[in-house]
Amino acid sequence: MSRNAELFERASRSIPGGVNSPVRAFRSVGGTPRFIKRALGPHIWDADGKQYIDYLGSWGPAILGHAHPEVVRAVQDAATGGLSFGAPTEAEVELAELLIQRLPSMEQVRLVSSGTEATMTAIRLARGATGRNKIIKFEGCYHGHSDSLLVKAGSGLLTLGNPSSAGVPPEFVAHTITLDYNNLPAVQTAFAEHGRDIACVIVEPVAGNMNLIKPAAGFLEGLRELCTRHGSVLIFDEVMTGFRVGPQGVQGLTGITPDLTTLAKVIGGGMPVGAFGGRADLMRHIAPLGSVYQAGTLSGNPVAVAAGLATLRLIGQPGFYEDLSARTQRLALGLTERAHAAGVTFSADAIGGMFGLYFRDKVPTSFAEVQTSNTEAFKRFFHAMLDRGVHFAPSAFEAGFVSAAHDDATLQATLDHAEAAFALLKA
């Protein structure tokens, strides 16, 4: 028995399903999860000592590659001064100022410890500020695991084949209106029927939790116009896309200004950090200034903040995103060319440092379309690549990530392995 198998068997006795986040269990692809022992640059090593080129990137945060020396040094330096204080620090002020500087839509920001906390509190803030109850979200978009948002959600719930979670009372989601992503007429109808009670619209401006799906032309602009007209709060969930697709996230690429933005992943540099922020008149409703409560023992944790500051400073260097985008586009195009050469039905898309792989003839534009992907073909491809030392997300419904550490040789090795893997699919 391999060391990975031994650890999974052992973990399954003490941890439900053997993992601490469902998609890690390999349920949708089969086989044994890889237990990671260490990581450096574009590579990870499992418990059996096997090396992989990693396109999971800790589900997005590792934009510089794993264990970047300057980030590690910042964490070590911060840790020597204390791990947690439960009191304000200068570093958390610096991180808040840097986020506000990078994202013009953010006039004020509050740090939390996860993306789920950020989206959960942004929803509460929108309701508290507007005095309204209903929220609009989109099918296949994932905004963390708070109860009111686990309705037709993406990410690991799609991997389970069930876009909603047990244990969520119907009353909790009675005020959640779930619509098709990229279907602006449906949103217009919802506002026509419920506009006076819609507190907010929350959206992944580029969806990354039902694989990668970009917004249709006019979709985000339409959401902005509807929210402005009806006095509702527009929330961009940029937990995944923030600082991953560009220096100002999707809002910078599109020029569309949300009222609130949620962040996590990249802003923590691999440590647990989340944030939400936006218009000052909205943020003034948060305690201790207002009556919308939010708190957290580890919010603004000094070690996590140090990692975030180091990461944001490094990715702010000129040319960083142009280079990252070019690398990601090369991967997506190269995989598509090799799949088609092998006669495999396949498409791919990319934006910034994110990419999507689809075993269907065209890039999907909706939750319904992405569900028509050939998941059996994905499983075979996933394991063929894993056997060759290339680590993709263990789900056909998750985006992938390229880092600054994925150099030309690493990308070429990936494409060479993919050529062999696609050939196996037609064998």
From Swiss-Prot:
PROSITE patterns, per database record: AA_TRANSFER_CLASS_3 (PS00600)
The EC number(s) this enzyme carries: 5.4.3.8
Molecular function as annotated in GO: glutamate-1-semialdehyde 2,1-aminomutase activity; pyridoxal phosphate binding; transaminase activity
Modified residues (N6-(pyridoxal phosphate)lysine): 265
Keyword rRNA processing: no
GO biological process, one term: protoporphyrinogen IX biosynthetic process
Pathway: Porphyrin-containing compound metabolism; protoporphyrin-IX biosynthesis; 5-aminolevulinate from L-glutamyl-tRNA(Glu): step 2/2
Top-level class of the enzyme under EC nomenclature: isomerase
Gene Ontology CC entries for this record: cytoplasm
Similarity comment text for this entry: Belongs to the class-III pyridoxal-phosphate-dependent aminotransferase family. HemL subfamily.
PANTHER family with a match to the protein in the record: GLUTAMATE-1-SEMIALDEHYDE 2,1-AMINOMUTASE, GLUTAMATE-1-SEMIALDEHYDE 2,1-AMINOMUTASE 1, CHLOROPLASTIC-RELATED
NCBIfam families associated with the record: hemL, PRK00062.1
Binding partners and assembly: Homodimer.
Protein known as: Glutamate-1-semialdehyde 2,1-aminomutase
Gene: hemL
